[in-house]
């Protein structure tokens, strides 16, 4: 198959997945016109031409981390009459409800020439995924190199058009398909030794690779799945200003943890080997559970003080300030009883938890001697609450 035939086959496949093909969007003007329609519809607003131009000036930035944040949050914009418009770029509450469109051979001018992109997926008019294709026999790594070259070209589309919102790159020669997140230059390198990390091949739950473009599209590019990949399973590492995509087995583990809890189906056991990213899996499960109103607390329990610090630092690396330090058992008890959203995810050692809950513990006996309520009595109201407890290293 020629590259053109592979491209057409992918567009047809996306059509089967209920994407809308937009052959009319061929350049920057068409991209912006479509984005404006989608933006106004989503936010139930009509912008003047000058407001729309100002909006573009505000949201378009070469900083990938900034655009990734803008894409996931409620933002504000001052209108010509001085009133504030709170808006989102996509439906962040339910990504499945966004419009999913596909464009091909989009041409964007740079300082010295132009760049042409094989296939782009637009989510609510935002170019969120770029797919570069090669013919069979040509390594997809050539497509990776092309993306890196495009990003280094002065005045490229990723720095001064809506392409700054690309979250994900996919490269394929039809039989071999890889994907990786967009990032700022310091986290986005490709060298002669063909090292490019982190780059992924998608996999099924049994970890068998899904490499053929048709199968990949079916599994990964289904609208709701792609929405989840971007919104749930891409982590914005604030401390490093970096986008990090979870590996397939981590995604399945998180899904199973969340399902198990939501269906109230008892306990579970996640078996990940050393260095496989257990902390990220636990962090993601905790943050997704944080938004479940039926759950009072999510406790992540480790067995040593140094692990407590290490895990807390890792969690805070993924999301700044998401976990506070429990300096002592009293702090832990206070946070367990707190209704504050910030205290919903707690990292603690099994020793501190034991001191609080064990009626016969030294701490509880000392409090009793001093005529104060035992921690175990203070925590009694939690008996009827739904608590999620994740034990690390529970072998």
What are these regions (language model features)?
Residues 172-173, 302, 391:
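Short beta-strand/turn micro-motifs composed of small residues
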Residues 336-339, 380-381:
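Short amphipathic alpha-helix with an adjacent loop that forms part of the alpha/beta core around
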Residues 356-361, 394-395:
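Conserved ATPase-coupling elements of RecA-like P-loop NTPase cores
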Residues 305, 326-335, 350-355:
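Conserved helicase motor
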Residues 1-297, 306-322, 341-345, 351, ...:
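ATP-dependent helicase/translocase motor core
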Residues 349, 392-394:
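Walker B catalytic acidic pair
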């Amino acid at each position: 198959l020629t590259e053109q035939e592979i491209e057409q086959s992918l567009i047809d496949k996306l059509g089967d997945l209920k994407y809308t093909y937009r052959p009319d969007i061929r350049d920057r003007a068409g991209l912006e016109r479509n984005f404006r329609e989608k933006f106004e519809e989503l936010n139930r607003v009509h912008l003047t031409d000058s407001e729309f131009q100002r909006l573009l000036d505000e949201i378009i930035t070469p900083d990938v981390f900034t655009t990734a944040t803008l894409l996931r949050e409620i933002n504000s914009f001052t209108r010509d009459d001085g009133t504030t418009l709170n808006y989102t770029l996509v439906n962040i509450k339910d990504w499945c409800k966004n419009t999913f469109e596909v464009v091909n051979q989009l041409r964007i001018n740079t300082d010295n020439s132009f760049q042409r992109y094989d296939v782009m997926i637009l989510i609510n008019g935002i170019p969120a995924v770029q797919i570069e294709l090669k013919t069979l026999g040509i390594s997809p790594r050539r497509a990776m190199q092309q993306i890196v070259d495009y990003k280094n070209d002065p005045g490229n589309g990723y720095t001064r058009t809506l392409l700054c919102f690309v979250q994900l790159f996919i490269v394929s020669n039809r039989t071999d398909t890889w994907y990786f997140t967009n990032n700022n230059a310091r986290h986005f390198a490709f060298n002669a030794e063909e090292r490019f990390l982190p780059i992924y091949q998608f996999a099924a739950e049994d970890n068998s690779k899904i490499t053929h473009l048709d199968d990949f599209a079916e599994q990964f590019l289904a609208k709701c799945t792609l929405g989840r990949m971007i919104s749930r399973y891409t982590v914005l590492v604030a401390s490093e200003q970096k986008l990090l995509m979870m590996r397939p087995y981590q995604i399945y583990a998180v899904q199973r943890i969340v399902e198990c809890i939501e269906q109230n189906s008892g306990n579970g056991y996640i078996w990940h080997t050393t260095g496989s990213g257990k902390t990220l899996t636990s962090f993601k499960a905790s943050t997704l559970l944080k938004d479940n109103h039926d759950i009072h607390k999510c406790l992540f329990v480790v067995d040593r003080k140094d692990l407590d610090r290490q895990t807390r630092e890792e969690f805070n690396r993924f999301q700044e300030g998401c976990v506070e330090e429990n300096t002592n058992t009293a702090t832990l008890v206070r946070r367990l009883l707190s209704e504050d959203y910030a205290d919903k995810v707690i990292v603690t050692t099994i020793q501190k938890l034991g001191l609080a809950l064990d009626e016969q513990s030294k701490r509880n006996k000392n409090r009793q001697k001093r005529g104060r309520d035992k921690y175990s009595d203070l925590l009694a109201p939690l008996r009827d609450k739904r608590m999620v407890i994740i034990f690390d290293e529970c072998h």
